[in-house]
Amino acid sequence: MKVYYENDADLNLLKDKTVAIIGYGSQGHAHAQNLRDSGVKVVVGQRPGGANYELAKEHGFEPVSAAEAAAQADLIMILLPDQVQAEVYKNDIAPNLKSGDVLAFGHGFNIHFEQIAPPADVDVIMAAPKGPGHLVRRTYTEGGAVPAIIAVDQDASGKAFDIALAYAKGIGATRSGVLQTTFREETETDLFGEQAVLCGGLSELIKAGFETLVEAGYQPEIAYFECLHECKLIIDLIYEGGLAKMRDSISDTAEYGDLTRGPRVINDKSREEMKKILKEIQQGEFAREFIAENMTGKAHFSAMRRIGKEHQIEQVGGELRKMMSWLKK
């Protein structure tokens, strides 16, 4: 896979454009500030009221409505939650799109699953740093960067890829490296990773381990330490050097248990379920379910959230974390 760096991107492609950042949240604040510091003209679309509006003002922007930002801009980056993008696009952005504009996204959900259907005379691109916004901003100010991925869904101008690469340079990503993907690949792999591994898989693994120990008569506090608290120690090692570094860093006892017992937890049945989850994503079943849930008031979603917060592991963890002076309160 080709990796694109500073010399591959031409920031001048953005010099005569106004970039609208729609949503001043986790990613929005980093994109807006980094682009501005790279010499790009930026307007922030953020509804009045709330912390993000005030934060944008603190950072030297004069936030306006999404509609006004879209009207002023030549490149519109939508960095809102997936479930609200389609409505904001329909009501505020689409009426203000001009032929030749660039519509940009940090995640491909609404384009891939056809919740947003841009006109044929605009470019549709993606530029997505592979890290949280605070890290995107901090590394930029330190002279480094978080790597990013870019994609093109619609190339009306014939320059969409180059514009996406220029945008990635504007937020600093070409300092570390930029990879090309597609909206389909980014969306489907992102959803799968969240559901099967990073969020869904890990959450259920932690809870199942905790419950197994507690049901066997062990103290909940000890079960919490062994099944949840120590995850960070292992994840940090994996993050820094992959599974190999983690295994090099743990005891032989732990490594032997990893290699011999791990496959009994994540077994052929688990892998079959992963394949089913991926198929549901690929066929749009998950997207339809998620969209319907949001359109009907999120009653089931809210109930699941409430049940999760009432789990014993949350109560135990809340008490134990009071003992941890290094955690931010």
Curated annotation (Swiss-Prot):
InterPro entries found in the cross-reference section: 6-PGluconate_DH-like_C_sf, KARI, KARI_C, KARI_N, KARI_prok, NAD(P)-bd_dom_sf
This protein's pathway: Amino-acid biosynthesis; L-isoleucine biosynthesis; L-isoleucine from 2-oxobutanoate: step 2/4; Amino-acid biosynthesis; L-valine biosynthesis; L-valine from pyruvate: step 2/4
Amino-acid positions noted as binding substrate in the UniProt annotation, renumbered to this chain: S251
Annotated positions binding NADP(+): Y24, G25, S26, Q27, R47, D82, Q83, V84, Q85, G133
Any GO BP annotation: isoleucine biosynthetic process
A Pfam family: KARI_N
Organism superkingdom: Bacteria
A single GO cellular-component term on record: cytosol
Active site: H107
Domain KARI N-terminal Rossmann, first and last residues per copy: 1-181
Amino-acid positions noted as binding Mg(2+) 1 in the UniProt annotation, renumbered to this chain: D190, E194
Keywords annotated in UniProt: Amino-acid biosynthesis, Branched-chain amino acid biosynthesis, Magnesium, Metal-binding, NADP, Oxidoreductase
Domain KARI C-terminal knotted: 182-327
Any one GO MF annotation of this record: ketol-acid reductoisomerase activity
Binding residue positions for Mg(2+) 2: D190, E226, E230
Cofactor note: Binds 2 magnesium ions per subunit.
Record's keyword annotation contains Glycoprotein: no
EC number, UniProt record: 1.1.1.86
Cofactors named for this entry: Mg(2+)
Catalytic reaction annotation: (2R)-2,3-dihydroxy-3-methylbutanoate + NADP(+) = (2S)-2-acetolactate + NADPH + H(+); (2R,3R)-2,3-dihydroxy-3-methylpentanoate + NADP(+) = (S)-2-ethyl-2-hydroxy-3-oxobutanoate + NADPH + H(+)
Family as reported in the entry's similarity comment: Belongs to the ketol-acid reductoisomerase family.
Purpose of the protein: Involved in the biosynthesis of branched-chain amino acids (BCAA). Catalyzes an alkyl-migration followed by a ketol-acid reduction of (S)-2-acetolactate (S2AL) to yield (R)-2,3-dihydroxy-isovalerate. In the isomerase reaction, S2AL is rearranged via a Mg-dependent methyl migration to produce 3-hydroxy-3-methyl-2-ketobutyrate (HMKB). In the reductase reaction, this 2-ketoacid undergoes a metal-dependent reduction by NADPH to yield (R)-2,3-dihydroxy-isovalerate.
Protein name: Ketol-acid reductoisomerase (NADP(+))
Organism per entry: Maridesulfovibrio salexigens (strain ATCC 14822 / DSM 2638 / NCIMB 8403 / VKM B-1763) (Desulfovibrio salexigens)
Gene assigned in the entry: ilvC
